């Protein structure tokens, strides 16, 4: 499933130029390159109301709670082959992002990972140490619609809507059940936005 992006062609050109620079800089050390889209999403005990099917004339009812305990999901998803990493973190900050990029780097040390992500302050923190087999490629400011990872969060949260979780353990189990339904094929289908896959294959076509 490919998504058509209504953005100027300069974006595709800019990303292509950055990808070419990354390839030229690292081609001697790495023979395999992959593209990932990275993002974070907060999920908590606050009930997420959504539409529901009922008998005609019957108003849908949903047990609701107004609690704000939450966790953060850190995710990186490849629109090229569907490879992905998901980690649950207590906070969204530089320390936890460091843990995540280190785990992503270890997932395959022989693969050079180009990570497409937003301009969050902790993504650019001076004390962040980017592993040698990872390059961060930043999207234009205020453009979440350009990040394919948003589609993955939508699928996961869809499984949690209209659900009542008594505690964080129940929520964690529900998140686990939702993420187990994802696989490489579904990740690739969700995240294969043309603007980034076309740019990648234009540069890494050999």
Describe the residue ranges of each PLM region:
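Charge-mixed, compositionally biased segments that are often intrinsically disordered regulatory tracts
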Residues: 1-67, 200, 204
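Generic structural signal for small/hydrophobic residues in well-ordered secondary structure
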Residues: 39-41, 75-76, 82, 101, ...
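Acidic/histidine-rich, metal-coordinating catalytic segments
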Residues: 111-123, 147
């Amino acid at each position: 499933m490919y998504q058509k992006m209504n953005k100027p062609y300069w974006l595709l050109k800019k990303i292509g130029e950055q990808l070419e620079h990354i390839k030229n800089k690292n081609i001697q050390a790495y023979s395999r390159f992959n593209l990932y889209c990275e993002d974070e999403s907060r999920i908590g005990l606050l009930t997420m109301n959504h539409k529901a099917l009922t008998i005609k004339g019957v108003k849908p009812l949903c047990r609701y709670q107004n609690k704000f305990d939450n966790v953060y999901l850190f995710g990186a998803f490849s629109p090229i082959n569907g490879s992905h990493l998901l980690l649950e973190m207590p906070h969204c900050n530089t320390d936890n992002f460091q843990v995540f990029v280190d785990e992503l780097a270890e997932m395959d040390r022989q693969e050079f990972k180009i990570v497409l992500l937003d301009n969050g302050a902790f993504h650019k923190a001076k004390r962040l140490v980017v592993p040698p087999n990872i390059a961060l490629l930043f999207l234009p400011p205020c453009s979440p619609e350009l990040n394919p990872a948003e589609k993955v969060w939508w699928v996961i949260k869809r499984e949690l809507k209209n659900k009542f979780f008594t505690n964080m353990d129940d929520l964690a189990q529900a998140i686990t059940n939702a993420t187990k339904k994802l696989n490489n094929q579904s990740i690739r289908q969700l995240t294969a936005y043309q603007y980034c896959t076309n740019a990648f294959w234009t540069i890494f076509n050999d």
